[in-house]
């Protein structure tokens, strides 16, 4: 018989330990079953370290065999070592408790490798805190049931993976996970702020941003509004415009009205109440069944940096309830004729509730496209223009969103990552050109409507049209944000997910890829309106090998389509203000602030070497004071003193026009950004290399170039429809 090593216990101690362990197991198994298993599963989906949680929640004393102290902690995947009895000991017939002990020991010997596999797979559900979901709760619950995720409707002591807020980022204080709101988004999409952001882009790229009606901000631009309208009328007496007035913070059509004359008495009253935007009314909209309608399109802002944008393939079309007529003094007050807001038309006696997606006062956007297609309309061109509108609008919003984000979640501090579903309200003109009406930070996700049974008595009736669109948007947003989903680095072309283009064997593909590899990206861009595979096809491994069952095999294909960075090459040249925001944030100095102080502005001028004999530092101080004072007088936010981002942009425009003359504004601004980024990169490299004593030699950027893009290369000014409308 081989002698045991010195580390092993004597045989007598083994017998005593085994007997003691069996007795402990017999006593513990009576109280073990349901309560222990329940406790193990309560928080198995907690965010953080799932492996550690699962190991800690196992019963501590049940089935434990006394062993010497471990010399090292087991690594990931290492099995627990269970010492065996010496062969010389006679083995008795195991009793029920001892048999349970042996099974527990064997199971725990394999538990280490199983824990990691189970926690990374479908057994560990994603946890969602829905306690702040509010009106989107019903659609969220349906989505979570379809995804088989775990909901915590009353919150949770431990962190959740995802927090679903109904109003804003600040609905609750969270330090980890993901939240479905960006800080500052509610402020950014208000009528006044959105108009200012789009106006900056219109000054830089007037042709690209002609999808937003001409707007004036009240009360600060009232005199400008009156004078400009008067000037146009004098030049063209036949011009008889109509204007629509929208309160800054209004929603659901509240406070909106139409006017023909800038000196209308109602407009004078608005000037004394609250900020508002007055816009030129679109008089020739596309009509269906003689009714005006708009489109509510859902857009997912998945990430701010890097920028990721998704658009839902279907939306809602909301109809007026009175036949449309061009506005005149007799029908200006007919809100059911001119305003498409659902919250207004629902109170019309002509509102039609329908479970059909193609009839009624609320229909799916896809049904409208089918109807237009039957009349010969180029649907791909319509989608192309809508995609372009959405990307350009988000590009206009992201600079200030970055400032809000660094203020609420400064670099280096704990905080959640953010995503958000936005509601874009778009109107199709008679010539099928899309026009942006507004952007909603909190689009309604209700899947029911109120039905008045009797005066003052309402009943909530499910809306199948709302449920069809909104549940899909929420569910697929969660699928895209799934924190446990494995990120695959191999991206197969979308064409191979089409039912008509099944993935051939690898041997058959290799020869064709050698000849057609260069055209795969072109083929991919032409598959926007493709059909998707069946559940069985989605559950197959495209590499041809065996794989684990797809946890999403029971779900339909994702209804959200990525449009950025997919089309980044076509739109990156528009991101000039985004690059200015990066400069602005760099010189803020104090974490959490949103305004640039005078010292930070001077540091910006010095580090970028913008001062000269014609622009002294005294002139820089005067520039800062004048612009900051003017912007502080018109902005509502007075939390911090200093220069806001929009004031910094105005100062940047002034410096660019002063330094680079005889160029279009966007080229002047791009040249100045290049110069600033060059000097700052040189400064950063000097700080890194100064201790090494290495000389730094870099050539300054070339400023005289024909066209500038955000990546430093030229970009086309006109985007072809075929490049955007297909995937």
Swiss-Prot record:
L-glutamate binds at residues 318, 342-343, 362, 470. Gene3D superfamilies: ATP-grasp fold, B domain. Residues 1-12, 49-63, 72-81 have a biased composition (Basic and acidic residues). One of its GO terms (cellular component) is microtubule. Residues 125-477 form the TTL domain. Residues 17-34 have a biased composition (Low complexity). This is Tubulin polyglutamylase TTLL11. It comes from Mus musculus. The lineage of its organism: Eukaryota, Metazoa, Chordata, Craniata, Vertebrata.
């Amino acid at each position: 018989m081989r002698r045991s090593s010195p580390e092993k216990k004597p045989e007598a101690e083994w017998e005593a330990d085994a007997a003691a362990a069996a007795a402990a197991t017999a006593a513990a198994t009576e109280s073990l079953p349901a309560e222990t298993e329940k406790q193990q599963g309560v928080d198995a989906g907690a965010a953080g370290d799932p492996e550690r949680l699962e190991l800690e929640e196992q019963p501590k004393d049940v089935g434990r065999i006394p062993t010497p102290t471990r010399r090292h902690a087991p690594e990931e995947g290492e099995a627990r070592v269970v010492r065996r009895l010496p062969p010389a000991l006679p083995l008795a017939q195991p009793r029920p408790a001892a048999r349970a002990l042996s099974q527990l020991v064997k199971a725990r010997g394999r538990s280490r490798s199983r824990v990691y596999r189970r926690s990374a797979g479908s057994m560990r559900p994603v946890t969602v805190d829905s306690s702040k979901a509010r009106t989107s709760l019903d659609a969220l619950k349906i989505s979570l049931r379809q995804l088989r995720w775990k909901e915590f409707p009353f919150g949770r002591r431990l962190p959740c993976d995802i927090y679903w807020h109904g109003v804003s980022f600040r609905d609750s204080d969270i330090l980890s996970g993901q939240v479905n709101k960006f800080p500052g988004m509610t402020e950014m999409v208000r009528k006044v702020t959105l108009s200012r952001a789009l106006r900056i882009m219109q000054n830089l790229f007037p042709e690209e941003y002609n999808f937003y009606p001409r707007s004036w901000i009240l009360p600060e631009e009232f005199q400008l509004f009156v004078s400009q309208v008067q000037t146009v009328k004098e030049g063209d007496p036949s011009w008889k415009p109509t204007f629509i007035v929208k309160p800054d913070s209004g929603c659901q059509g509240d406070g909106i009205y139409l006017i023909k004359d800038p000196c209308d008495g109602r407009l004078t009253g608005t000037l004394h109440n609250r900020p508002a935007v007055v816009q030129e009314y679109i008089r020739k909209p596309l009509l269906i069944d003689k009714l005006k309608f708009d489109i509510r399109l859902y857009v997912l802002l998945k990430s701010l940096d890097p920028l990721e944008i998704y658009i839902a393939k279907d939306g809602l079309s909301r109809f007026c309830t009175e036949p449309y007529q061009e506005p005149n003094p007799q029908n200006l007050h007919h809100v059911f004729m001119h305003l498409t807001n659902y919250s207004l038309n629902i109170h019309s006696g002509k509102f039609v509730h329908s479970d059909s997606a193609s009839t009624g006062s609320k229909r799916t956007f896809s049904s409208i496209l089918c109807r237009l297609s039957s009349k010969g309309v180029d649907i791909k061109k319509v989608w192309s223009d809508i995609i372009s509108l959405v990307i350009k609008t988000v590009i206009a919003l992201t600079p200030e969103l970055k400032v809000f984000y660094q203020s609420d979640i400064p670099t280096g501090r704990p905080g959640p990552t953010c995503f958000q579903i936005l509601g874009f309200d778009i109107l199709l003109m008679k010539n099928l050109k899309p026009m942006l009406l507004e952007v909603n930070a909190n689009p309604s996700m209700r899947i029911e409507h109120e039905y008045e049974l009797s005066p003052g008595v309402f009943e909530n009736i499910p809306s199948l049209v709302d449920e069809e669109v909104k549940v899909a948007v929420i569910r697929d947003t969660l699928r895209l944000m799934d924190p446990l989903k494995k990120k695959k680095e191999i991206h197969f072309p979308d064409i191979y997910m089409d039912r008509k283009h099944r993935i051939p064997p690898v041997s058959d593909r290799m020869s064709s890829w050698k000849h057609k590899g260069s055209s795969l990206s072109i083929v991919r861009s032409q598959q926007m309106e493709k059909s998707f595979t069946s559940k069985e096809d989605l559950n197959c491994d495209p590499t041809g090998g065996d794989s684990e069952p797809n946890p999403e095999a029971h779900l339909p294909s994702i209804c959200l389509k990525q449009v950025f960075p997919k089309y980044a090459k076509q739109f990156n040249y528009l991101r000039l203000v985004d690059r200015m925001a990066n400069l602005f944030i760099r010189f803020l100095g104090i974490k959490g602030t949103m305004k640039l102080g005078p010292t930070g502005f001077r540091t910006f001028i010095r580090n970028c070497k913008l001062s000269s004999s014609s622009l002294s530092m005294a002139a820089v101080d005067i520039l800062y004071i004048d612009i900051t004072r003017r912007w502080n007088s018109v902005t509502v936010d007075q939390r911090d003193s200093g220069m806001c981002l929009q004031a910094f942009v105005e100062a940047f425009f002034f410096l660019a026009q002063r330094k680079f003359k005889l160029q279009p504004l966007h080229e002047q601004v791009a040249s100045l950004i290049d110069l600033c980024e060059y000097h700052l990169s040189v400064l950063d490299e000097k700080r890194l290399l100064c201790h090494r004593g290495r000389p730094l030699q870099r050539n300054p950027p070339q400023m005289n170039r024909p066209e500038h893009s955000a990546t430093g290369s030229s970009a086309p000014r006109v985007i072809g429809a075929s490049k955007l409308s297909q995937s």
